[in-house]
Amino acid sequence: MCSLFGLIDFKECLSTHTKNKILNTLARECQVRGTDATGIAYNFNDRLRIYKRPLPARKMKIHIPHGVNVVMGHTRMTTQGNAQFNQNNHPFLGKVDGSSFALAHNGVLWNDKELRMEENLPMTSVETDSYVAVQLLEQQKTLDFDSLKTMAEKVDGSFVFTVLDKDNSIWFVVGDNPLCVMFYDGFLIYASTQEILCKTLKKLRLKAPIDILEPQEGEIMRINRNGRITTGTFTPHTTFEHWWRKYPFYRSYYEDTPASYDDLFSVAKAFGVTADEVQALLDYGCSEEEIEEMLYDPELFHEMTGELLYAY
């Protein structure tokens, strides 16, 4: 479980200070979905810049230079690939036709190893499943609706991809994970969930947006630096394994023993965490492994569960 976030100041109406404030607030609110690493990508002086560190957003000060109007970000909860090796963190750098792009992913891909063999993709030291999306785009030597469609239809898993290109457009490739974009008069912000954006607005004391967009599964959306939107579609690659992972509660019909979280509750109790807090995260969709990892950061754990239990 990770989070995507970012902004496009398409009328160049925000000061650099305001953009940095928005980005830092967004990133910190995104910690609810990942604290292992934080990263951003933007274009500056005709070069794509990626800044990422194996740190939670609250410990990493995001600072973009004057003149940057498009920023793509990511907060990570590790599923594959050690976050301490920074190459495994998002966004990732890719190149097509001599131009650089940055890609970030929220979700889990299950056929990355198979794709590397089937597509004869080059060996890489990057250990994450997400990086196969970069390689599939590089293989096609172009970045457009067709290449993104091809990539999205080859990967199997849960995903939303964001891609920042050299022209300062952000591409959104929406699978079965959430995404929300809020529009204002002159700029937009986005994150993986509307809840994250609402909490960000509250902390920044921003007014209600003039429009909210939540793209659906199978949509590809490009928003350029002027705020113009163009769209395309793809057919999600769905397999029985994907369905089985997405709807694990169906397993209870076939397993002799229903899932029990007694061990998890006992471990949590040793950390001073109540069963209600653990259950709130389970209901939210966190796995046992994710919850056990979060137990080692009690301050963040209680902050997250507090928001889930007492959300306004």
Stretches with model-predicted labels:
Residues 1-312:
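Conserved short alpha-helical segments that host acidic/polar catalytic motifs at enzyme active sites
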